[in-house]
């Protein structure tokens, strides 16, 4: 249940509902009472953070990193997103409260908003919490999420076209003559799952059968990444290319290949994802799918404020571009 739903039932605007539930004297008492009783009958919870924002009290946006236990907050892509968000929040004259939550502490997201600690939430990543995020949206918790746009999502999402990115990366490798293409990414996560869909589509179009031995489940920013890579390479499987779902994984792979005297790109071509700053400075420079991090922060803040105002939910899909460098040529 969202503020726009109550507005539709009451025959008023979302801003009128917002003012009525915050006790604004600008709304006639009879109207305030009618809207308040309707909201109570529907078990709609007033967002203390949003009410405080309207009164000018709360000047803080909560930024939540949904992290696996092994994921490092120092991951370059996460740091890039945080930097972009900080700039966008500062432009609004507000502050940022950063929290790192695991699946077992997910209920803190709701309490952060309902207690008035923050105005709304910007959530980085979805992990396997898609249904929980939907529940929060139905409770009227204002938020915007960085991740994959899913068909049944009730919350606004900002992200790149992950399926297209996976398709472009794999098609490029196929065009270079590759046929035994390994995929590195944890497909239980929505973003990596969509990238694998694009990878599989490109392989199918080229008439290349997927080899399950070349599909490796690696978490974004896993601290045990190098250990896992070494274990996989020690199997001595036949492959001529690798598409990794993050640049950090791709760069780690290139280091492991170099230690085994396997040359990139003459023996194995490598493509990453994200286009972090380091991607163009490693040797050889890394071909990657660029996510426009600089645009992400502003888009997330815009959607979060729209959610606070009770505006209809929408998604923003940022441009997805393959950046070709030496690692795949």
Whereabouts are the PLM-identified features?
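N-terminal helix-turn-helix DNA-binding module of bacterial transcription factors
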Residues: 1-59, 329
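Short acidic/polar active-site loop segments enriched in Thr and Asp
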Residues: 13, 59, 119, 178-180, ...
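Alpha-helical recognition/docking segments in bacterial nutrient-uptake
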Residues: 60-171, 232-234, 238
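Short hydrophobic segments within beta-strands
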Residues: 64, 124, 146, 183-184, ...
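Hinge/beta->alpha junction and helix N-cap segments in small-molecule ligand-binding domains
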Residues: 67-80, 98-106, 158-168, 184-230, ...
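Short acidic capping loops at alpha-helix termini that bridge into adjacent secondary structure
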Residues: 180, 210-214, 264-269
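Flexible loop/turn connectors
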Residues: 226-329
């Amino acid at each position: 249940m969202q503020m726009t739903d109550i507005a539709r039932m009451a025959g008023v605007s979302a801003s009128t509902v917002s003012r009525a539930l915050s006790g604004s004297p600008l709304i006639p008492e009879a109207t305030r009472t009618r809207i308040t009783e309707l909201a109570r009958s529907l078990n709609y919870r007033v967002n203390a953070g949003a009410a405080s924002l309207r009164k000018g009290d709360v000047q803080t946006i909560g930024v939540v990193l949904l992290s696996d236990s092994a994921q490092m907050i120092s991951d370059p892509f996460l740091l890039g997103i945080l930097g972009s968000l900080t700039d966008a929040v500062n432009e609004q004259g507000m502050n940022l409260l950063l929290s790192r939550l695991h699946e077992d502490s997910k209920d803190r997201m709701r309490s952060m908003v309902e207690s008035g600690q923050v105005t709304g939430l910007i959530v980085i990543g979805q992990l396997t919490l898609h249904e929980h995020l939907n529940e929060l949206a139905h409770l009227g918790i204002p938020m915007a999420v960085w991740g994959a746009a899913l068909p049944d999502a009730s919350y606004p999402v900002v992200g790149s076209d992950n399926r297209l990115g996976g398709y472009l990366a794999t098609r490029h490798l196929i065009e270079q003559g590759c046929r035994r293409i390994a995929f590195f990414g944890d497909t239980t996560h929505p973003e990596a799952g969509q990238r694998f869909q694009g990878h599989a589509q490109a392989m199918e179009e080229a008439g290349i059968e997927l080899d399950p031995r070349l599909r490796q489940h690696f978490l974004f920013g896993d601290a045990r990444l190098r250990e896992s890579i070494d274990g996989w390479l020690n199997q001595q499987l036949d492959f001529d290319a690798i598409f990794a779902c993050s640049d950090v994984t791709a760069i780690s792979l290139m280091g492991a290949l170099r230690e085994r005297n396997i040359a990139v790109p003459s023996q194995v071509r490598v493509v990453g994802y994200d286009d972090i700053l380091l991607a163009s400075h490693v040797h050889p420079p890394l071909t990657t799918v660029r996510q426009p991090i600089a645009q992400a922060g502003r888009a997330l803040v815009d959607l979060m404020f729209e959610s606070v105002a009770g505006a209809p939910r929408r998604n923003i899909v940022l441009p997805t571009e393959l950046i070709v460098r030496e690692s795949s040529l």
